[in-house]
Amino acid sequence: MSRIVHFEVPADDPERLIHFYEEVFGWRIEKWDGPIEYWLVMTGPEEEPGIDGGLARRSEPDFGVEITVDVADLDQALAGVKSHGGEVIRPKSAVPGVGWMAYIKDTEGNVLGMMESDPEAA
């Protein structure tokens, strides 16, 4: 069974949204030390229930808040998306040092991320 492991919030003005979430929810938000403009969102202590997420500059107008589902085999999961009426909208690509990522639309048009963890991804 695949679990939701991450959320991502798009922002037209990342600094404004960071300030909003820090002040309203008390979340800790830090710039990611990676190859893209991205911020890590910590929603609470690791030992408590919940998930953390990320914040990125909005790149596509139809993307809202997106959840990411962890999958054991991304290629197999993408084949399942296609065979069950979904659509791959961003193909598999590497997130260096993290894993392999793709974005899909389900049968109702909802956008989800799918991630296969792989620290060797490059």
Where do the protein language model's features map onto the residues?
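Mid-chain, well-packed structural core segment of small domains
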Residues: 60-89
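Short, charged/polar, Gly/Pro-enriched secondary-structure boundary elements
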Residues: 46-52, 109-112
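Short acidic/glycine-enriched loop/turn segments that link adjacent beta-strands
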Residues: 34-38, 61-63, 95-100
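N-terminal beta-strand motif that seeds the catalytic metal site of vicinal oxygen chelate
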Residues: 1-18, 65-69, 116-122
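Vicinal oxygen chelate
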Residues: 9, 30, 78-79, 84-122
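Core segments of cupin and vicinal oxygen chelate
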Residues: 2, 8-50
